[in-house]
């Protein structure tokens, strides 16, 4: 799992930061899942090493323009490029009407199938590898955070050890790989866990924006490996955050601390903290690290690989 930040500014783009979009790359299945799609996202994709042709799912947090204005353009470009990949889009219920209006008035004809789902808190998608769920955040309009949870993978099955024990190949290997206890024809009972290496613990990535500090974000982020959380304002501008229902750097850090995440990555920064101003992003980082040490600042085109943990099968 690799996270690539395509836009890390709030509200408007700057010379060094585009508006919101994050790509979650899943190399093992040659897929990219996109989170938010602000204006100019397709340009950012072209400047990165993320392949547009691998986008299969797009998750939209809310209907503010800096999170959706690039969506129809990206879909249209995918169609013109002849991408055969179907795309599933998840977002607030109003997203369906927005896309229909864009398609109607710009007369876009998509050559690939696009499915749009209005979300509600709970599980949105599940397959053999991942579960994606969402929760309601606290913003001026309905906004949803997303949690991507990878399922645990069994450790490597030791075929050589199984052969040495005289276990015949066949369907029984599948049972042992799943950690089941199997009785052999000769009466021996074999615990599959004894033949498997360390379990690969599933990783969890959480994306929370736009929101002021809220219990919904804490609940969604519980025990996460990586929390991507907005930090629009510095702590001294907390009143602005409360007025506009955005987060400060310290609010993001508090969510990370209470939720027990391993890594906090802050994003969605106000342009008021650009270089040359009295307060700068390094100040926001220092504020957050005073509360939660494992904090870093996102920047456009930064890639973060989510580490995998292994634990011994019991």
From Swiss-Prot:
The keyword Signal does not apply. Keywords: Endonuclease, Hydrolase, Metal-binding, Nuclease, tRNA processing, Zinc. Disulfide bonds: none annotated. Binds 2 Zn(2+) ions. One of its GO terms (molecular function) is 3'-tRNA processing endoribonuclease activity. SUPFAM superfamilies: Metallo-hydrolase/oxidoreductase. Zn(2+) 2 binds at residues 66-67, 210, 268. The keyword Zinc applies. NCBIfam families: PRK00055.1-3, RNase_Z. Zinc phosphodiesterase, which displays some tRNA 3'-processing endonuclease activity. Probably involved in tRNA maturation, by removing a 3'-trailer from precursor tRNA. HAMAP family: RNase_Z_BN. Belongs to the RNase Z family. This is Ribonuclease Z. It comes from Rippkaea orientalis (strain PCC 8801 / RF-1).
